[in-house]
């Protein structure tokens, strides 16, 4: 294609198929590449927000699958990630609640990986495994993400794309307080991959849980999941942000009485 042009008017008229409202579509920031297609969330005005793909042509721009007929199945589309020949995302099919899905770009190859939270809510609907602020990233051989199985709260999980290979990595905050997900419990954020490792920030500061802020690293195993820098040793910490991998080094900024640059190879001194 030469020049600069709109690929396709997915939802003719107004509102558009892509907006800055996460419940209607997506912002232009949220585009994911798999093979020679770009994947994104869009609403054509009929099917709700679903997974779409485009090869850069109008005829090659299409909905991958209507996951939730009439309801819009795609959820939290700003945390999609790609591993091997599949794109991973969260979706609600109207039966299982919001769960982990994957797609190879075909209708038949778009499927739920595992129903992580099988609990039934008082409303009669299925519980969601994913909150609106869950995180997800890809290492060299797995997807690392946060999820709630209804027992441990929002915690650290991994998947290789199979139900059997989808498992809890570690309960970072044992008991009723989760390590991730809600303002009244701990929160995980800034998840960033480096080779076969994933780095992330945990802020555990809720009623009943001790105040603890730390940068963590994980290789997808319990023994390989630990804090590389924490408020116990650093003193006052207000935040840890800016996780950026360069080669085999992860850089991040620790805030608290000023901001300081840190670097880690994933080990503790």
What are the roles of these predicted feature ranges?
Residues 1-269:
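Feature 14080 marks short, conserved micro-sites in well-ordered regions
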């Amino acid at each position: 294609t030469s020049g600069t042009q709109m690929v396709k008017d997915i939802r003719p008229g107004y509102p558009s198929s892509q907006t800055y409202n996460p419940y209607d579509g997506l912002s232009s920031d949220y585009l994911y590449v798999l093979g020679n297609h770009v994947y994104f969330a869009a609403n054509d005005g009929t099917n709700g927000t679903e997974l779409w793909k485009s090869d850069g042509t109008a005829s090659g721009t299409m909905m991958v699958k209507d996951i939730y007929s009439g309801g819009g199945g795609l959820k939290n589309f700003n945390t999609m990630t790609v591993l091997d020949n599949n794109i991973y995302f969260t979706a609600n099919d109207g039966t299982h609640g919001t769960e982990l899905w994957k797609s190879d770009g075909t209708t038949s190859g778009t499927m739920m990986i595992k129903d992580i939270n099988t609990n039934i809510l008082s409303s009669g609907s299925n519980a969601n495994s994913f909150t609106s602020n869950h995180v997800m990233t890809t290492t060299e051989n797995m997807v690392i993400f946060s999820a709630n199985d209804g027992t441990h709260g929002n915690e650290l999980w991994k998947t290789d794309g199979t139900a059997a290979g989808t498992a809890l990595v570690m309960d970072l905050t044992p008991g009723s307080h989760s390590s991730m997900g809600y303002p009244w419990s701990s929160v995980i954020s800034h998840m960033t991959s480096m080779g076969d490792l994933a780095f992330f920030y945990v802020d555990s500061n809720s009623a009943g849980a001790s105040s603890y802020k730390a940068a963590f690293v994980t290789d997808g195993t319990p023994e390989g999941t630990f804090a590389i820098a924490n408020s116990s040793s650093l003193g006052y910490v207000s935040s840890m942000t800016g996780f950026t991998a360069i080669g085999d080094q992860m850089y991040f900024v620790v805030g608290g009485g000023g901001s300081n640059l840190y670097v880690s190879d994933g080990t503790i001194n």
